[in-house]
C-alpha cells in the first residue's frame, strides 16, 4: 500500500477498456447476488468470492482451506484465494459488454465533450447513440471519384429504364381505354358510364406517372446523397440508408450506436483537427471563432495528455468492490441492498440477453433495440436521471447511481472524506463551572473513564494492580476504587478538546485540562462561553481526546483556552467578563454620589485598614474615602501629584500617594497586575472591555489569563453580595406619561384631519405620524429615565451593560412605541401601553406581526450564512503563509489620523480594522528622523505615537500587494490577530479569514428594505449584500460610473432619461440610460472625473475594474463589505476581506496568445500567466496579453487548479469530467485535497519544513548552560523525542483577589 505522506501529486484520467480489465479480478457474468437459502455469494455473480475475495478471513468458499496458515493459496475446488475478508473493499470486477456503450458524462455533460470533439450537435449525437440515425464512419473517396462516371452512367440507364417502363405502361393503358370505350359505344352505353370509365383510366395513368416519378426522385436522392457523402454524415431515414447500402455499400461504411462513434474516434486525426481549428481562430470572427476556441480546448486536452478519445466509449464496465455496495439481512429475513446492485443487475441482464440474441442471429431491429437498452442501463448506472426518466426502485424512488454516491452533502466527498466521525469522543450537556480556572473544564467521571480507558488499563498493569490488560479491563468495568485514583493520575495535564456545534470559527474548538466532577454534565468556564457562543439552556458539547504526544503538545500550546484570549477576526479579547460578573464589578466600583453612606470622608493608612473597617461594619464599599497606597502602586492616568512642602523631595512615579476613592475601587485594583495604572472610575461593560483590551495588548498571556480569572471570581462574589434582584416593583411607570401621550394624540388627530380633507397624501400622513410618535416615545423614555434612581436594580443592569438596554427598559416601563410589520415597514399606529401596564388585544396582535417575521428570518439567515462560510472557506483554503518575506516594495497607503474642523489630529475611526496589526512598508521619517522603521508591527502603542507626531497616513504591507508565488508571506500579512505576534509560517490564514467573515454572518440582517420617501428604491443590505459583493454580481439598480472625465448633459424625454458625458479629450460621447426615478449625483453642466458615480446606488465591481483598474476595485470591495458589517456593529479586520478579494482577482483572461502556449479567451492563474510570458520573452517570442478577471467566490472555487478541492465543493460530475479529459494533476497544495486523501495538511506543523526536525543546542546555549551549572551532569546529545509532558500554568499563583 502506498504511504500517503510520500507522494506529491494525484492524477485523474480516462480509463480505457484495458485499464478496466487490468484492475479487475474477474468477470461478473451473472446478475445473481447471494443464494437465499445458504446466504453465500453466487459463483460469477455480483458478490462472487472467486472474483472479490472470501467473505470470512482466511477461509475459502467450499471450506477446504481454513486458518491463516493457508494464506495466499488459491483453492483448486472453488477458486477462492485464502486471504483477509477486507480485500472485498478493494478488489474490483468487470462486465464484458456485448456491444460498446458511450460514457454518459462525456456525451451528456454541458458542454458535450464528445460533441465538441467530433463537431456534432448533442441532438445528433443522441440520435446516433440511441439508434435513431445512422452515422457514416468511412468513405472510399478515391474509388468513388474513380468510379463516379461509370456509376453515373449506370444511374442514368436506370432512370431511362424507369421512364421507358412508365411510357410503355401508359401506352398499354391508353390502348385498353380506347378498346373499352369502343366496346361501350357499340353497346350503346350512356355518356355517363363512358365518362366514368375514362376518369378511372386517367386516374390509373396518373398513378403510373406518380409511381415512376417517385422512383426517379428516390433514385436521384440516393445518387445525390451518395455523391456528396462525407464521413460523420447522419442519416435518419432508414429506407434511404438501406437503399444507399444496397446500391453503393462497397464505397462506404456506416452504423448506429456507440460502435459508430468508436469507429469514428479510432480514425479521428487530432493533430489535423487542431491545426484546422487554429486556422479558423486566426481568420474567423464571432460565433465561428468562439466555437472553434471551445473545440480546440477539448482537442488539445487529448493532444497534450496520454488520454485517448476512445476512453469515452466503453467495451467493458468496472464493477466496484462488493463491500462498497453491501447487502445486509434485516430482521424479518428480508434483505436491504445498495441501489448499485440493482443497477448492475440491469446491465448484466441486458448484456446477457444481447449476447444470446447475437448468438441466435436475431434480426437487426431487435438487436439494435437491445443495444439501446444496454446503453440506457449503463447510463443509469453511471448517472441515473441525467437523460430521460430516472430508473426507480420501490416507492418510485430514483435509484442512487455512481455519480450520486459522490455528489452533494451525503456524497462520498463531503460525508466520508471531509467529515469523518472519530473515536475517543464523547458528548454531554454543559453547565457552568464558576470555580474553574480559565484553562480547565469539568469532565464527568463516567465520561473520563470511558475516554481514558486504554490509558487507565495500561497504568493499572504498570502499577501491578492488574496482571494483564484483560483483568485491568475487568477492573475498570466493575468500577473498583483504585481505578478512580489511577484515572486522576492519568488525566493530569492531559488536555482534552471541547467543541460546540456549529463550529463557526477556530474558537469553536478549544483545549482544556480536565478536572473530574460528579454527575453527567460537562462543566465550562464562564469566560469561554462567548467564544463558543454557548449558554446553559441545554446546549451540548463534544469532547475529543488528543492521543499522541504531538497532538497533546499542539492542543496545549496552540489550543489551550488561556492561549486563545484574542478573537481572530479583529485581534481583540473575546474572553470578556459578562452578565453577573459585569454587574458585580460595577457594584464594586460605583461611588455614593449625592448620598452619605457610612464612613464617608474618612482616611485610611492602607487598603487593609479600610477592609478591616468594612468587615467591622463601619464602612460601605461606595463611600468616598482617602486611602494611602504603598510604594510601587501606579496612580491613575492624569493623576496630579500632591503639592510638596518646603524641603520635601519632589513626588516621583512609584512613591506612595493618597487618593480620594472608594474601598470598592481599591479592591478592584487588587485584581489587576501590580504595575497597571490605578482605575478610579465606575467600571461598566465598556470600561471593562477597554481594560481587558489594554491588558491583552501590553501583558503576557499568563498574566492576562490570571487577571481574567480574578475578575471572574470577584465579579461573581460581589454580584452575589450586591443583592441585585428584579421585582415588578422595580419597574416604575413615569407619572408624566399620560400627559405626554395626551399631547401627542392631539397632534395625531390634527394630521388625520388634514389627510381626510385631502391636504396631504397618504405617504405624507404616514411619515408625519411616525415622526410624531417617535418623538412621543423618546419623551416618555426620558421621563422614565429621570424616574429611575441610580440604585434601581433594573437601571443598574442596563447602565453597567450586564444585560438589556434602554430600548427594552422603555418597552417595559415607558411605552412600546412604533413596531414594524413583516415587510419591515413601520406601522403608523403606536402601541401606547408598556409591558408593565399590559397590552390590549389589538396592540398585542400588531406587535406579534413583526416578531414572527424576525424568527423566520433568523432561521433562513443561519442557513444562508453557513453556505456563505462554506464558499469562503473553499475559495481561500489554500492561502497559507509559505515564506517569511516575499521581498516586495509595494504596499498600501492607509490613513491613521484625520483632522477635525478645528484642525486637531484625531485617530481615524477605522484604524482598528485597517492599519492595526500590519507591517510598515517603509520608514516613517519626520524632519530627517526615523520615528518608526520599516517592517515593524503597527500596534496600538506605535499608532498612538505616530498620531502624536502628526503623521496622517502610512504605507503598510498588504496581502493585496504580496508577490509570493504560492500562498502569501508573513510580512505582507503582518500580525496574527489570534496570537498578537507576527504570523507563523504554515498558518492557514485563508481559512481564518473565511471564518472571520462567515461567523458574524448570522448577525447580519436579511433585508432588502424600502427607504421611506422613495417608492421602489430598494437597497440590498445585510447578508444578501455581502453575498452579492463576494459573488461579484451586478447589483440591483446599478449606478453608472463615468468612463472618462468630461462635462455632463442630461437628456430627458417623456419616457426615458439619460446622462450624456462629453469627454474632455474630444472622443465619442457616452450615454447612460437611467430610470426616471433615479436620484442624480451630478447636475447639468457639471464636470465629472473618470470613474465618478453618476446616480445614487451601488456600482458594478466589473465596471470599476474595467475603468479604474485592479487597485480601485480592491478598495471598493473592501469598503463595501466593511460598510455592511459596520452597520451591524461587527468588527472584522480588512486583511481578512483582502485575502478573499485576492483570490477573486487571481486569474487573467488571455486576449492575445502571442507565442505563449495559451488559448485566447482562456482563464489562467496569474502566476502561470507570468511564468509562461517570462519563458516566451527569454526565448525571444511575443508574450501573451491578458486582462485581470474578477470572479465570484463560487466560480473561483470551481476554477481552482486542484480538481479534488473543486469536485468536493459543487458540480462534482462536471468537475471530474473536465479533470479526467485534461488528465489533471492535483499537486496537493491546499488543505481540502490533503484531508480527502488522508495526508497531513500542509499547514501548521504539517508543513514539510516542520516535520522530522532535529533540535540541537547552539554554541551560545551550551555556553550559557556551562556557566549556569556544573557541566558534567548535562547530556548534550541531540534531544530525543518529547515525553508529551508540559509545564502547568499554576506556576503563577496570584492568590485570592482581596489579599
Curated annotation (Swiss-Prot):
Q: Which residues bind Mg(2+)?
A: 535, 537, 539
Q: List keywords of the entry alphabetically.
A: DNA-directed RNA polymerase, Magnesium, Metal-binding, Nucleotidyltransferase, Transcription, Transferase, Zinc
Subunit structure, briefly? The RNAP catalytic core consists of 2 alpha, 1 beta, 1 beta' and 1 omega subunit. When a sigma factor is associated with the core the holoenzyme is formed, which can initiate transcription.
Parts of the chain that traverse the membrane: none
**Gene that encodes the chain:** rpoC
Q: NCBIfam families from the xrefs?
A: PRK14906.1, rpoC_TIGR
One GO CC term, this protein: DNA-directed RNA polymerase complex
The name under which this protein is listed is: DNA-directed RNA polymerase subunit beta'
Organism whose genome encodes this protein: Streptomyces coelicolor (strain ATCC BAA-471 / A3(2) / M145)
Instruction: Name the cofactor(s).
Output: Mg(2+); Zn(2+)
Top EC class of this enzyme:
transferase
Give the cofactor note. Answer: Binds 1 Mg(2+) ion per subunit. Binds 2 Zn(2+) ions per subunit.
Amino acid at each position: 500500500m502506498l504511504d500517503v505522506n510520500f507522494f506529491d501529486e494525484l492524477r485523474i484520467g480516462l480509463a480505457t477498456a484495458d485499464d478496466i480489465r487490468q484492475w479487475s479480478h474477474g468477470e461478473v457474468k451473472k446478475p445473481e447476488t447471494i443464494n437465499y437459502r445458504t446466504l453465500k455469494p453466487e459463483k460469477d455473480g455480483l458478490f462472487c468470492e472467486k472474483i472479490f475475495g472470501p467473505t470470512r478471513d482466511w477461509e475459502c468458499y467450499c471450506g477446504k482451506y481454513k486458518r491463516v496458515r493457508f494464506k495466499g493459496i488459491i483453492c483448486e475446488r472453488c477458486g477462492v484465494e485464502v486471504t483477509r475478508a477486507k480485500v472485498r473493499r478493494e478488489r474490483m470486477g468487470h462486465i464484458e459488454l456485448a456491444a460498446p456503450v458511450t460514457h454518459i458524462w462525456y456525451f451528456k455533460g454541458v458542454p458535450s465533450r464528445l460533441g465538441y470533439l467530433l463537431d456534432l450537435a448533442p441532438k445528433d449525437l443522441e440520435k446516433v447513440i440511441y439508434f435513431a440515425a445512422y452515422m457514416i464512419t468511412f468513405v472510399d473517396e478515391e474509388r468513388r471519384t474513380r468510379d463516379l462516371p461509370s456509376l453515373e452512367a449506370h444511374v442514368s440507364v436506370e432512370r431511362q429504364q424507369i421512364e421507358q417502363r412508365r411510357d410503355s405502361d401508359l401506352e398499354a393503358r391508353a390502348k385498353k381505354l380506347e378498346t373499352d370505350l369502343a366496346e361501350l359505344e357499340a353497346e350503346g352505353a350512356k355518356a355517363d358510364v363512358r365518362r366514368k370509365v375514362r376518369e378511372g383510366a386517367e386516374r390509373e395513368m396518373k398513378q403510373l406517372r406518380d409511381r415512376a416519378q417517385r422512383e426517379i426522385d428516390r433514385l436521384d436522392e440516393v445518387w445525390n446523397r451518395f455523391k456528396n457523402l462525407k464521413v460523420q454524415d447522419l442519416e435518419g431515414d432508414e429506407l434511404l440508408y438501406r437503399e444507399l447500402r444496397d446500391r453503393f455499400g462497397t464505397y462506404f461504411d456506416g452504423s448506429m450506436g456507440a460502435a459508430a462513434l468508436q469507429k469514428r474516434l479510432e480514425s479521428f486525426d487530432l493533430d489535423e483537427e487542431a491545426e484546422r481549428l487554429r486556422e479558423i481562430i486566426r481568420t474567423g470572427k464571432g460565433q465561428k471563432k468562439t466555437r472553434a476556441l471551445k473545440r480546440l480546448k477539448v482537442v488539445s486536452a487529448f493532444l497534450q495528455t496520454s488520454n485517448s478519445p476512445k476512453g469515452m466509449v466503453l467495451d467493458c464496465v468496472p464493477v466496484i468492490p462488493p463491500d462498497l455496495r453491501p447487502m445486509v439481512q434485516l430482521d424479518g429475513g428480508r434483505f436491504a441492498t445498495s441501489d448499485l446492485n440493482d443497477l448492475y443487475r440491469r446491465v448484466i441482464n441486458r448484456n446477457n440477453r444481447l449476447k444470446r440474441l447475437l448468438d441466435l442471429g436475431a434480426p437487426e431491429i431487435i438487436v439494435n433495440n437491445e443495444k439501446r437498452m444496454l446503453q440506457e442501463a449503463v447510463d443509469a448506472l453511471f448517472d441515473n436521471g441525467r437523460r430521460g426518466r430516472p430508473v426507480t426502485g420501490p416507492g418510485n424512488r430514483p435509484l442512487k447511481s455512481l455519480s450520486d454516491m459522490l455528489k452533494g452533502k451525503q456524497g462520498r466527498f463531503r460525508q466520508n472524506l471531509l467529515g469523518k466521525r472519530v473515536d475517543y469522543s464523547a458528548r454531554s450537556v454543559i453547565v457552568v463551572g464558576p470555580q474553574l480556572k480559565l484553562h480547565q473544564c469539568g469532565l464527568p467521571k463516567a465520561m473520563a473513564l470511558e475516554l481514558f480507558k486504554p490509558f487507565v488499563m495500561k497504568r493499572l498493569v504498570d502499577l501491578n494492580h492488574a496482571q494483564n490488560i484483560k483483568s485491568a479491563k475487568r477492573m475498570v468495568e466493575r468500577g473498583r476504587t483504585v481505578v478512580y485514583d489511577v484515572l486522576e493520575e492519568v488525566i493530569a495535564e492531559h488536555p482534552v478538546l471541547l467543541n460546540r456545534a456549529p463550529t463557526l470559527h477556530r474558537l469553536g474548538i478549544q483545549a482544556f485540562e480536565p478536572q473530574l466532577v460528579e454527575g453527567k454534565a460537562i462543566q465550562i468556564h464562564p469566560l469561554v462561553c462567548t467564544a463558543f457562543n454557548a449558554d446553559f439552556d441545554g446546549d451540548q458539547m463534544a469532547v475529543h481526546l488528543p492521543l499522541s504526544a504531538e497532538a497533546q503538545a499542539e492542543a496545549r500550546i496552540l489550543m489551550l483556552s488561556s492561549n486563545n484570549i484574542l478573537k481572530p477576526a479583529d485581534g481583540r479579547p473575546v474572553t470578556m467578563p459578562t452578565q453577573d460578573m459585569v454587574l458585580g464589578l460595577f457594584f464594586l466600583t460605583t461611588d455614593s454620589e449625592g448620598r452619605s453612606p457610612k464612613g464617608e470622608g474618612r482616611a485610611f493608612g492602607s487598603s487593609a485598614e479600610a477592609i478591616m473597617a468594612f468587615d467591622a461594619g463601619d464602612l460601605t464599599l461606595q463611600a468616598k474615602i482617602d486611602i494611602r497606597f504603598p510604594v510601587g502602586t501606579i496612580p491613575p492616568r492624569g493623576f496630579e501629584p500632591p503639592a510638596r512642602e518646603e524641603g520635601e523631595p519632589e513626588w516621583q512615579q512609584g512613591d506612595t500617594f493618597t487618593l480620594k476613592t472608594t474601598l470598592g475601587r481599591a479592591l478592584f485594583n487588587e485584581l489587576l497586575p501590580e504595575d497597571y495604572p490605578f482605575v478610579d472610575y465606575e467600571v461598566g461593560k465598556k470600561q471593562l472591555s477597554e481594560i481587558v483590551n489594554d491588558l491583552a495588548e501590553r501583558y503576557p498571556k499568563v498574566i492576562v489569563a490570571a487577571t481574567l480569572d480574578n475578575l471572574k471570581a470577584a465579579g461573581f462574589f460581589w454580584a452575589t453580595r450586591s443583592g441585585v434582584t428584579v421585582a415588578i416593583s422595580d419597574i416604575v411607570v413615569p407619572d408624566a406619561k399620560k400627559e405626554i401621550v395626551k399631547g401627542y394624540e392631539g397632534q395625531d388627530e390634527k394630521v388625520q384631519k388634514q389627510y381626510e380633507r385631502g391636504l396631504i397624501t397618504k405617504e405624507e400622513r404616514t411619515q408625519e405620524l411616525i415622526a410624531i410618535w417617535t418623538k412621543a416615545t423618546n419623551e416618555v423614555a426620558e421621563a422614565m429615565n429621570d424616574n429611575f434612581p441610580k440604585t434601581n436594580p433594573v437601571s443598574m443592569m442596563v447602565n453597567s451593560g450586564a444585560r438589556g438596554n434602554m430600548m427594552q427598559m422603555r418597552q417595559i416601563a415607558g411605552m412600546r412605541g412604533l413596531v414594524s410589520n413583516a415587510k419591515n415597514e413601520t406601522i403608523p399606529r403606536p402601541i401606547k401601553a408598556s409591558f408593565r401596564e399590559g397590552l390590549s388585544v389589538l396592540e398585542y396582535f400588531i406587535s406579534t406581526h413583526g416578531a414572527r417575521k424576525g424568527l423566520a428570518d433568523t432561521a433562513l439567515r443561519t442557513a444562508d450564512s453557513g453556505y456563505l462560510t462554506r464558499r469562503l472557506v473553499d475559495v481561500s483554503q489554500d492561502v497559507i503563509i509559505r515564506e517569511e518575506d516575499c521581498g516586495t516594495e509595494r504596499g498600501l497607503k492607509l490613513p491613521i489620523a484625520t483632522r477635525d474642523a478645528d484642525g486637531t489630529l484625531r485617530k481615524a475611526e477605522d484604524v482598528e480594522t485597517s492599519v492595526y496589526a500590519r507591517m510598515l512598508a517603509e520608514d516613517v521619517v519626520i524632519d530627517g528622523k526615523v520615528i518608526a522603521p520599516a517592517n515593524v508591527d503597527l500596534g496600538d502603542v506605535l499608532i498612538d505615537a505616530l498620531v502624536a507626531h502628526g503623521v496622517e497616513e502610512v504605507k503598510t504591507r498588504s496581502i493585496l500587494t504580496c508577490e509570493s508565488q504560492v500562498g502569501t508571506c508573513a510580512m505582507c500579512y503582518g500580525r496574527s490577530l489570534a496570537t498578537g505576534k507576527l504570523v507563523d509560517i504554515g498558518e492557514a490564514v485563508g481559512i481564518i479569514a473565511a471564518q472571520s467573515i462567515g461567523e458574524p454572518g448570522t448577525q447580519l440582517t436579511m433585508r432588502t428594505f424600502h427607504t421611506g420617501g422613495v417608492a421602489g428604491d430598494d437597497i440590498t443590505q445585510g447578508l444578501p449584500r455581502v453575498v452579492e459583493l463576494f459573488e461579484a454580481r451586478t447589483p440591483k439598480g446599478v449606478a453608472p460610473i463615468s468612463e472618462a472625465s468630461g462635462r455632463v448633459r442630461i437628456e430627458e424625454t417623456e419616457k426615458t432619461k439619460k446622462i450624456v458625458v462629453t469627454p474632455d479629450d474630444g472622443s465619442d460621447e457616452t450615454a447612460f440610460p437611467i430610470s426616471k426615478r433615479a436620484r442624480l449625483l451630478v447636475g447639468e453642466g457639471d464636470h465629472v472625473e473618470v470613474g465618478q458615480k453618476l446616480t445614487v446606488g451601488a456600482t458594478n465591481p466589473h465596471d470599476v475594474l474595467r475603468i479604474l483598474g485592479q487597485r480601485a476595485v480592491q478598495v471598493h470591495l473592501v469598503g463595501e463589505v466593511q460598510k455592511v458589517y459596520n452597520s451591524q456593529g461587527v468588527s472584522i479586520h480588512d486583511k481578512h476581506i483582502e485575502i478573499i478579494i485576492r483570490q477573486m482577482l487571481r486569474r487573467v483572461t488571455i486576449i492575445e496568445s502571442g507565442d505563449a502556449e495559451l488559448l485566447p479567451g482562456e482563464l489562467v492563474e496569474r502566476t502561470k500567466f507570468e511564468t509562461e510570458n517570462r519563458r516566451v520573452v527569454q526565448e525571444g517570442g511575443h508574450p501573451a496579453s491578458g486582462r485581470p478577471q474578477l470572479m465570484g467566490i463560487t466560480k473561483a472555487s470551481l476554477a481552482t487548479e486542484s480538481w479534488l478541492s473543486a469536485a468536493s465543493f459543487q458540480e462534482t460530475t462536471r468537475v471530474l469530467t473536465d479533470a479526467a479529459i485534461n488528465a489533471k494533476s492535483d499537486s496537493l497544495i491546499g488543505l481540502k485535497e490533503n484531508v480527502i486523501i488522508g495526508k497531513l495538511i500542509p499547514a501548521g506543523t504539517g508543513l514539510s519544513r516542520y516535520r522530522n526536525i532535529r533540535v540541537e543546542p547552539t554554541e551560545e546555549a551550551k555556553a550559557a548552560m556551562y556557566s549556569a551549572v556544573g557541566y558534567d551532569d548535562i547530556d548534550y546529545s541531540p534531544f530525543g523525542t518529547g515525553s508529551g509532558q508540559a509545564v502547568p500554568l499554576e506556576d503563577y499563583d496570584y492568590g485570592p483577589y482581596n489579599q
